């Protein structure tokens, strides 16, 4: 039995994805399998990426498992559960196609963070060299250099961040994952955070493992930020048992103020003006998402980053 496998959902992967695979194959703790669940085979075939992908595995002991699903069948939780079903490893790591291991020890550090109580670890996200100033500081704010173990006792001090975790790069112990019912399905996003909630509510711990690093960032436009935060708001509105008594707005305000302070201190005045615009887009999207049930279906689809979800 393999110690660890890696599951990656893909949609129109590019050359950056090939770089991610190269880094995974070079890990000190090599995955037994890399399981790719791709959406839209027709697009995949047109890119010719499969031939390049198979070449990377020719000299590796890691096995490539490739499955295709239709676009209408994609579901953040169910698709990853499908990937996990192809694994028999003791642990598995979920990644996104645009996350690249920072060094050869990303998986090693994720697994080193596990113990009898810690059943999920997630990696630090460091910005790409092309990330703008706002995105760089945001990553540093959300993914600091110090590791942290989170449990039920931290709810009063950490608030919403108690349950924060990211499948951009996260490791899970399979036995506990199965015992707690796997990822929730039918969710627009936040399958990682919802599972972290289940762990913590059942007495387990989640660890932010700062030594495990992946390169991952986005220079989103204001419109894209609106759409993404609409989906976040909709996710929270759909899970009141988690989010009703824990507010996330205060953490968002704290991040905006800290970012503004940093931009002004570094004389990045144009970025400071842009931060106001981006933050307004985020908050407007979040509020709209929290109230999605009051909006017409056509408006919801227009506001959402994941239009297929609302079909």
Segments (PLM) and residue ranges:
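Short, flexible, basic/aromatic active-site loop/helix in glycosyltransferases
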Residues: 141-162
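Short beta-strand/loop segment that forms part of the nucleotide-sugar
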Residues: 32-42, 67-69
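Short, well-formed alpha-helical segments that are part of the catalytic scaffolds
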Residues: 13-26
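Acidic donor-binding loop at a coil-to-helix junction in glycosyltransferase catalytic cores
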Residues: 189-195
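Conserved donor NDP-sugar-binding/catalytic core segment of glycosyltransferases
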Residues: 104-136
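Non-catalytic, C-terminal membrane-associated alpha-helical segments of glycosyltransferases
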Residues: 231-234, 238, 245-311
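Short aromatic/hydrophobic "clamp" motif used to bind/position activated sugar donors
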Residues: 92
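Glycine-rich, basic loop-to-helix element that forms the pyrophosphate-binding segment
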Residues: 70-87
């Amino acid at each position: 039995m393999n110690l660890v496998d890696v599951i990656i959902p893909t949609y129109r992967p590019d050359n950056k994805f090939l770089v991610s695979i190269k880094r995974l194959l070079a890990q000190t703790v090599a995955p037994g399998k890399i399981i790719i669940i791709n959406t839209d085979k027709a697009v995949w075939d047109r890119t010719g990426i499969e031939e390049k992908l198979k070449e990377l595995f020719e000299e590796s002991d890691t096995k490539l498992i490739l499955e295709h699903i239709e676009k209408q069948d994609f579901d953040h939780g169910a698709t990853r559960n499908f990937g996990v079903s192809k694994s028999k490893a003791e642990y598995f790591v979920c990644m996104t196609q645009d996350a690249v291991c920072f060094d050869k020890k990303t998986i090693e550090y994720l697994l080193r963070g596990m113990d009898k109580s810690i059943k999920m670890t997630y990696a630090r996200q460091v910005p790409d060299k092309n990330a703008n100033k706002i995105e760089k500081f945001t990553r540093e704010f959300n993914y600091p250099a110090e590791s942290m173990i989170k449990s039920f006792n931290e709810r009063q001090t950490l608030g919403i961040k108690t349950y924060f975790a990211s499948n951009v790069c996260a490791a899970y112990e399979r036995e506990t994952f199965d015992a707690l019912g796997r990822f929730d399905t039918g969710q627009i996003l936040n399958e990682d955070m919802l599972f972290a909630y289940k762990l913590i509510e059942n007495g387990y711990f989640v660890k932010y493992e700062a030594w495990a690093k992946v390169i991952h960032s986005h220079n989103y436009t204001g419109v894209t930020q609106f759409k993404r935060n609409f989906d976040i708001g909709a996710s929270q509105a759909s899970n009141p048992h988690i989010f009703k008594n824990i507010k996330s707005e205060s953490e968002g305000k704290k991040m905006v103020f800290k970012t503004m302070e940093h931009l002004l201190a570094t004389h990045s005045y144009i970025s400071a003006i842009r931060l106001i615009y981006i933050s307004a887009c985020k908050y407007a999207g979040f509020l709209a998402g929290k109230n999605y049930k009051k909006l017409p279906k056509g408006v919801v689809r227009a506001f959402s980053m994941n239009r297929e979800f609302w079909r």
